Amino acid sequence: MASSLEKLISSFLLVLYSTTIIVASSESRCRRFKSIISFGDSIADTGNYLHLSDVNHLPQSAFLPYGESFFHPPSGRYSDGRLIIDFIAEFLGLPYVPSYFGSQNVSFDQGINFAVYGATALDRVFLVGKGIESDFTNVSLSVQLNIFKQILPNLCTSSSRDCREMLGDSLILMGEIGVNDYNYPFFEGKSINEIKQLVPLVIKAISSAIVDLIDLGGKTFLVPGNFPLGCYPAYLTLFQTAAEEDHDPFTGCIPRLNEFGEYHNEQLKTELKRLQELYDHVNIIYADYYNSLFRLYQEPVKYGFKNRPLAACCGVGGQYNFTIGKECGHRGVSCCQNPSEYVNWDGYHLTEATHQKMAQVILNGTYASPAFDWSCSGSESVDKEYSFSS
């Protein structure tokens, strides 16, 4: 009798212990976010570069047709409408994340976005020392992070929650960042082998920023990879060649440029795995921007795009509707009638329709690793296809 009772108690304790482990694991994966903190470049810039610009020399993103599909008037976003970060905010039931520069009242409640058009993962001084001297934004990832650290104490004093708790309740979007570290030398004519030498340094810069934010209390990171650059009108124009073997016969993209993007992504995933093992109390999610976009080039019609996905919607000239020096927003440059039928917006950036398609498959876990449990995020929809506002 006593033996049976002991076994029963032992079994109960084992079940209780197992349940505790499952609950703890579930809590570590499933978090109700109260804000989004964003770092990066134009892929996530919601107006920073616009507010940093000279009022007499405003960027193209300050004028139509930028923003024509949603924001009316333009908001400084480099697209015809919403970005991936906007769709993530919608899904989480959070406000669109305002740009830090130009904001009157910066707060955790609204979220904060430090992403700036043209930003690099590596500091400007370092890139110039490597002979990369393009006229890029001097707001690298480390500069963005330092600004955040400087304002963090003020953000916390206005709330009953402490800094670590507030940052722990935030989804931290780390980019995309790093593509400009490669864009500039590519457009200066440097070889792929030369540019490959930058990849470990770019990965280290991203990793260091994540570690700094973990030390500050960050618990959930969404870290995007690089894009299939060989499918972009700007690159297709720059590296245009009549040789058929230089292009993928199925998509028309340039394989060697896409392989470079994949090389960056493999290095990034390896580093994120290392960080996850080192900091097992946080969630580090890799967002596969490469494949979530590349599938649209593979089967454009299936996803509602024209059967000519390599051309820019807004641009002029050539096979890809793109001419360097006559980009979208310049006089005499026209825009397509229906941006939702195009993958690419202006040669360098994507349309709102593309951003939506990418956000859907990242949020549903198809192109996120590991897939995140959004069931307690506050969103009403956790199905395969998410319903965003229009």
From Swiss-Prot:
Example of a GO biological process term: lipid catabolic process
Keyword Signal set for record: yes
Primary location recorded for the protein, binned into one broad class: secreted
Subcellular location per the Swiss-Prot or TrEMBL entry: Secreted
Recorded superkingdom: Eukaryota
Glycosylation-annotated residues: 105, 138, 321, 364
One GO cellular component term noted in the UniProt record for this chain: extracellular region
This protein's record includes keyword Lipid metabolism: yes
EC number: 3.1.1.-
Signal peptide extent: 1-26
Entry annotation: catalytic residues: 42 (nucleophile), 346, 349
Group of enzyme by EC: hydrolase
Sorted UniProt keywords: Glycoprotein, Hydrolase, Lipid degradation, Lipid metabolism, Secreted, Signal
GO terms, molecular function: hydrolase activity, acting on ester bonds
Family, as annotated: Belongs to the 'GDSL' lipolytic enzyme family.
Name this protein carries in UniProt: GDSL esterase/lipase At1g28640
Taxonomic source organism: Arabidopsis thaliana (Mouse-ear cress)
